């Protein structure tokens, strides 16, 4: 079974949260890639989705999701909808996902896929991810799916008390970071080296 093979690989890579594994099993990744790539959809690898963007490797989706949901967040902000795959995984795990995408055509396609899967606990908008979604915050958790050159202040400002921000940071050398808010204090942990497309300031029609 192709899905089980991927789950076994994720378990071997130390993904332990059964909720994350169950969500990944439920989301048909082939719907989120080009038809020509559908045969690779359940491979544990990143794939191109056009516009210089990618659908992240399932391991990285699982790893970031596992970090994000440790405190059982209800309202989550995702920066970089992309194909909508990570959005769909989150939608199986939290009460509501707010997601922002700077490339309008990607955002349109992602919305269509999420509707097709009857995932109605998602609010999506076209906009500049560096700015977050201030009038919907604060958020219990924020996930960024592209590498910011530095941690965006607008995002830490939109993090609720006890909230978590998971994001890749850096230019040529990138690291996955976990930032947690306790009152007015922010603590940051560097977790592992990663490779993501850059988080670009601005939006595109």
Curated annotation (Swiss-Prot):
<dbReference type="InterPro" id="IPR000682">
    <property type="entry name" value="PCMT"/>
</dbReference>
<feature type="active site">
    <location>
        <position position="56"/>
    </location>
</feature>
<keyword id="KW-0949">S-adenosyl-L-methionine</keyword>
<comment type="function">
    <text>Catalyzes the methyl esterification of L-isoaspartyl residues in peptides and proteins that result from spontaneous decomposition of normal L-aspartyl and L-asparaginyl residues. It plays a role in the repair and/or degradation of damaged proteins.</text>
</comment>
<keyword id="KW-0808">Transferase</keyword>
<dbReference type="GO" id="GO:0004719">
    <property type="term" value="F:protein-L-isoaspartate (D-aspartate) O-methyltransferase activity"/>
</dbReference>
<dbReference type="GO" id="GO:0030091">
    <property type="term" value="P:protein repair"/>
</dbReference>
<keyword id="KW-0489">Methyltransferase</keyword>
<dbReference type="GO" id="GO:0005737">
    <property type="term" value="C:cytoplasm"/>
</dbReference>
<dbReference type="InterPro" id="IPR029063">
    <property type="entry name" value="SAM-dependent_MTases_sf"/>
</dbReference>
<dbReference type="GO" id="GO:0032259">
    <property type="term" value="P:methylation"/>
</dbReference>
<dbReference type="GO" id="GO:0036211">
    <property type="term" value="P:protein modification process"/>
</dbReference>
<protein>
    <recommendedName>
        <fullName>Protein-L-isoaspartate O-methyltransferase</fullName>
        <ecNumber>2.1.1.77</ecNumber>
    </recommendedName>
</protein>
<dbReference type="Pfam" id="PF01135">
    <property type="entry name" value="PCMT"/>
</dbReference>
<comment type="similarity">
    <text>Belongs to the methyltransferase superfamily. L-isoaspartyl/D-aspartyl protein methyltransferase family.</text>
</comment>
<keyword id="KW-0963">Cytoplasm</keyword>
């Amino acid at each position: 079974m192709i899905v089980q093979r991927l789950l076994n690989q994720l378990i071997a890579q130390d993904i332990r949260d059964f909720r994350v594994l169950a969500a990944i099993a439920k989301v048909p990744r082939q719907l989120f890639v080009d038809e020509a790539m559908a045969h690779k959809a359940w491979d544990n690898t990143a794939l191109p989705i056009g516009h210089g963007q990618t659908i992240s490797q399932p391991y990285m989706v699982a790893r970031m999701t596992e970090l994000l949901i440790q405190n059982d967040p209800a309202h989550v902000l995702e920066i970089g909808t992309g194909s909508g795959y990570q959005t769909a995984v989150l939608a199986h795990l939290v009460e509501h996902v707010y997601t922002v995408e700077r490339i309008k055509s990607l955002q349109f396609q992602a919305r269509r896929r999420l509707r097709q899967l009857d995932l109605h606990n998602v609010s999506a908008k076209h906009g500049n991810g560096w700015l977050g979604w201030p009038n919907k915050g604060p958020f219990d958790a924020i996930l960024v799916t592209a590498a910011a050159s530095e941690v965006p202040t607008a995002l830490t400002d939109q993090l609720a008390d006890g909230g978590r921000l998971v994001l890749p940071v850096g230019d040529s050398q990138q690291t996955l970071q976990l930032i947690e808010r306790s009152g007015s204090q922010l603590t940051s942990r560097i977790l592992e080296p990663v490779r993501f497309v850059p988080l670009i300031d601005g939006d595109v029609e």
